[in-house]
């Protein structure tokens, strides 16, 4: 299942950039990172978190826009080393990354896009992603359960099928 990714958050200290990796199967945010600099280190940090959550990812696909941070040699090499295929949106077509774009739109609607400080933004993002979104947010595409519950249910079904 593809992992789409990315927004820009404003603070008096300057911009803060957020890279997010969403598992399209469950809508679970498996990796994320923030930084005052949008570069390959930001997306590599998010990828590292995703791999810690999911382990080696043979057969998985990573989908992003065509930003230089995603096109960097370091990022492409990290994907290859992890068994992940790289997919990039067509130039100028935001619909190719619709899940990610929708996620960021919801985030900005619910949290806003201006924060008092980088520290406040990071704290609120942690709470939003790890506590609210992954654990509590119900999704119509998941039969109105949270990403965490959807994954638990899927694992239970798989376990029962393997035992049969």
Model regions: which residues?
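Charged DNA-binding/catalytic regions of mobile-element recombinases
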Residues: 1-164
């Amino acid at each position: 299942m593809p992992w789409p990714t990315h927004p820009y958050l404003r603070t008096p200290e300057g911009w803060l950039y957020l890279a997010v990796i969403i598992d399209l199967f469950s809508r679970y945010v498996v990796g994320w990172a923030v930084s005052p600099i949008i570069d390959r280190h930001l997306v590599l940090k998010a990828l590292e978190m995703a791999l810690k959550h999911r382990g080696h990812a043979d057969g998985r696909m990573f989908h992003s826009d065509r930003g230089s941070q995603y096109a960097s040699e370091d990022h492409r090499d990290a994907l290859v080393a992890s068994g992940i295929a790289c997919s990039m949106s067509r130039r100028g077509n935001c619909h190719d990354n619709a899940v990610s774009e929708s996620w960021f739109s919801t985030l900005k609607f619910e949290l806003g896009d201006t924060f008092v400080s980088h520290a406040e933004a990071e704290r609120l993002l942690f709470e939003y992603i790890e506590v609210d979104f992954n654990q509590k947010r119900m999704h119509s595409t998941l039969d109105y359960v949270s990403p965490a519950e959807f994954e638990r249910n899927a694992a239970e079904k798989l376990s029962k099928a393997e035992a049969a």
